[in-house]
From Swiss-Prot:
Gene3D superfamilies: 2.70.40.10. This is Deoxyuridine 5'-triphosphate nucleotidohydrolase. It catalyses: dUTP + H2O = dUMP + diphosphate + H(+). Pathway: Pyrimidine metabolism; dUMP biosynthesis; dUMP from dCTP (dUTP route): step 2/2. It comes from the Viruses. Its cofactor is Mg(2+). PANTHER family: DEOXYURIDINE 5'-TRIPHOSPHATE NUCLEOTIDOHYDROLASE (PTHR11241:SF0). Its EC number is 3.6.1.23. The lineage of its organism: Viruses, Varidnaviria, Bamfordvirae, Preplasmiviricota, Tectiliviricetes. One of its GO terms (molecular function) is dUTP diphosphatase activity. Belongs to the dUTPase family. GO terms for biological process: dUMP biosynthetic process; dUTP catabolic process. This enzyme is involved in nucleotide metabolism: it produces dUMP, the immediate precursor of thymidine nucleotides and it decreases the intracellular concentration of dUTP so that uracil cannot be incorporated into DNA.
Length: 178
């Protein structure tokens, strides 16, 4: 039994609004329509439209041959697939697809391994997650309100909780500390 009441993620909508739709166009016969792998998946899997080699310690741009039109008030975020990273050291470059973009959506893949990695046409390479946009009016100030944290960053909130047997993020980022 699911303690939160549901084992799936429903589409983001409210009863007083029409059901949102994600429209897409295939630019070639190689384009694979986006798919949610499970009913509870947050994103739509994106597939490579071509065979592409990602060089060792390099990167490659992988076209999906898909063009999208997002529901009003949403944009698309390109997110990694955990399996590619865990098994093959392949990561996805962050990507934002603006709602007014009408070009071929491509995915930047980074290969952190010592061997080249072959992507085949039809391979899942990333996921597309739709997120709502907030675009507030800008207001410049001469100074902002104070907080307890202030300008402390890069691991500062975890400094008191770091186990002495573990290295903190700052130790890994600071040259000569290892």
């Amino acid at each position: 039994m699911d303690p939160f009441g549901s084992s799936s993620v429903p589409p983001c909508s409210t009863s007083d609004l029409p059901e949102p739709k994600l429209y897409f166009v295939r630019l070639s016969p190689h384009a694979v329509p986006p798919v949610r792998a499970t009913h509870g998946a947050a994103g739509y899997d994106l597939f490579s439209a071509y065979d592409i080699k990602v060089p060792a310690r390099g990167r490659a741009l992988v076209p999906t041959d898909l063009v999208f039109q997002f529901p009003p008030g949403c944009y698309g975020r390109i997110a990694p697939r955990s399996g590619l990273a865990a098994k093959f050291f392949i990561d996805v470059g962050a990507g934002v697809i603006d709602p007014d973009y009408r070009g071929n959506v491509s995915v930047v893949l980074f290969n952190f391994s010592e061997s080249s990695f072959n992507i085949r046409r039809g391979d899942r390479v990333a996921q597309l997650i739709l997120e709502r946009i907030m675009v507030p009016e800008l207001s410049e100030l001469t100074q902002l309100g104070e907080t307890d944290r202030g300008a402390s960053g890069f691991g500062s909130t975890g400094m008191g909780a770091v186990d002495r047997n573990q290295r903190s993020v700052l130790e890994w980022l600071t040259p000569g500390s290892r």
